[in-house]
């Protein structure tokens, strides 16, 4: 193998359990976003646009959809003999293999992959954030400061700082303290989960961490604190662009809505920084004589005979005559029946919603079964569910994937209820 100055390791094994039914059958990085993409496309495209041509994608939870999406890396120009994209799954490691025990352990298990390229630097990325970033500028900053590790940070609202790993720094950006989700933060500089390490330094710490049976084998909890404690040169690289952890239903919905605001906070139309993804083989979208679309993203293959307002539609969505979709996300190949009204909902892939359905109505009461997941007024329908004609569905309702019309307990699903596979409602 030819030596590489820098390679990327993209951590894409997370379940994303806070996304509820959206990640019941796929990993969080494979979740659809923005009418066209999957979340992982942003980190992969950042690599391409930053001239990083060697990427190892570390998968674990429900990897099939992700593996199929990435393939040999052609959409990102990573179908290469030397370098390119490689899927690194723990279950490929014969009888001695084991599941990744943490983010640091995931990298430790793939030391041999990194060593093949003898890089001077390794950039560790998370596959479940939405942002556009030039990693080569971060690498320049790392070199200028003779750093052992550089951590990309972003200012978050003070009231949210306790949800993140927080970096406390000197004025010049050198890190003197790291606090994981502090109750009383001293800074609002949050880690973005983007790290550049000198590879030989990181490898030493990964090997030592693996030998510590009490370690959680996590970058934030173990590797970074250990390096700081031992006086390694660690620097914070401040990022000023758009960055979102779309790890909750509300954050995911809000980030999609950001794309269709009057002046989009996150611009996907920048020709200088393209986001690449496999393109569906579908015709252009069609708006019929009874159709209307306002302030929405409508992808290829959609057929619109109803009204779509302030919404994001993925490829192949069919909106029947008289139907109305407002403030909603409708994923690929779903069908919305005649005279159906959809308000502030997330509809999964290949869902069939019947005629005369009203969804997202009533009181905004947190979901009874999972109030910590469904509490922002958004109703979520899992993939390939079938919603029967005439159904009235409230807010913060969750409908399991693959539910059939016959499994609905009634045609009136009140706010805060859950319709579970098997016909139960809670």
From Swiss-Prot:
Keywords: ATP-binding, Carbohydrate metabolism, Glycogen biosynthesis, Glycogen metabolism, Nucleotide-binding, Nucleotidyltransferase, Transferase
Protein EC: 2.7.7.27
Molecular function GO terms recorded: ATP binding; glucose-1-phosphate adenylyltransferase activity
One example of a Gene Ontology biological process annotation: glycogen biosynthetic process
InterPro entries, alphabetized: ADP-Glc_PPase, ADP_Glu_pyroP_CS, GlgC_bac, GlmU/GlgC-like_hexapep, NTP_transferase_dom, Nucleotide-diphossugar_trans, Trimer_LpxA-like_sf
Disulfide bonds: none
Top EC class of this enzyme: transferase
Residues holding alpha-D-glucose 1-phosphate: 100, 165, 180-181, 191
HAMAP family: GlgC
Role noted for this protein: Involved in the biosynthesis of ADP-glucose, a building block required for the elongation reactions to produce glycogen. Catalyzes the reaction between ATP and alpha-D-glucose 1-phosphate (G1P) to produce pyrophosphate and ADP-Glc.
Similarity-based family: Belongs to the bacterial/plant glucose-1-phosphate adenylyltransferase family.
Quaternary assembly: Homotetramer.
Protein name: Glucose-1-phosphate adenylyltransferase
Species of provenance: Acetivibrio thermocellus (strain ATCC 27405 / DSM 1237 / JCM 9322 / NBRC 103400 / NCIMB 10682 / NRRL B-4536 / VPI 7372) (Clostridium thermocellum)
Name of the coding gene: glgC
